[in-house]
Amino acid sequence: MQSTSLSRPIPVFSNRINVNSPSLSTIISYPHFTEREYSNRLKEIYSLGIDFIFSVGRTKIGSMEIAGKGCVSLVVKAEIKNTICALKIRRTDASRKTMDREVNLHRIANSAGVGPGILDYSENFVITEYIDGLSIINWINNQNINPEQVRNVINSTMEQCYKLDKAHLDHGELCRLDHHVIVSQSDATNIIDFESSSTKRKTCNVTAAAQSLFLSGLVSKRVNEILHLPEREKIIKALRIYKQDQSRNNFDNIMSISVR
């Protein structure tokens, strides 16, 4: 696992909502609320020991702020016995009937040393370690970061991608790196959200992340401003070689060319 402070005791906040509160009903049973579904899910929440959910995050549903929203689940900040965690809530309209598949894929990532650790799960919920930090795009737009910090974050992110390639787990969404990499206050990087992952596709974690970091999009634009990347053709050639043979030597070649 990545070296960052993930689970810790917390003080009392005004946005800390007891799980019994009716204000959480539309989040717990999002997007189609029924009394029966809500009641069943509340029992699951009790069994998992979840005490509070926080209204905090960059996404809003009604008056509730949450950490994220995807096609399969919502993510909220939660508390279990005075410890912060992340809680994934399966959407009532999700194509998947349980969270089992995602848990299995997430565990493969964890076995490779990637991603926040899974703490517990049930049919409709997954509890993981909480990553306290900024999305990589918000982090890199900070005017106070220096080239060495950027190199370290890129190296860490790409190393994790290489580990996923070697574990034969394709994340599936690393071409949209800004939504799936969080950088902590200590500049530790964490790849999150494995709901689109697969062991059946050819892995392209390194090449997808490199595209976002070095070649196209807002993150790469800022990286280039700070590090003055080499010619695109050199990076593209190295990525093509790696795509044919995902060896350590070919990975190191990408990094030596890109992050000088």
Residues covered by each model-derived region:
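Protein kinase catalytic-loop region centered on the HRD/HxD motif
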Residues: 161-172
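ATP-binding glycine-rich loop module of kinase domains
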Residues: 39, 47-100, 107
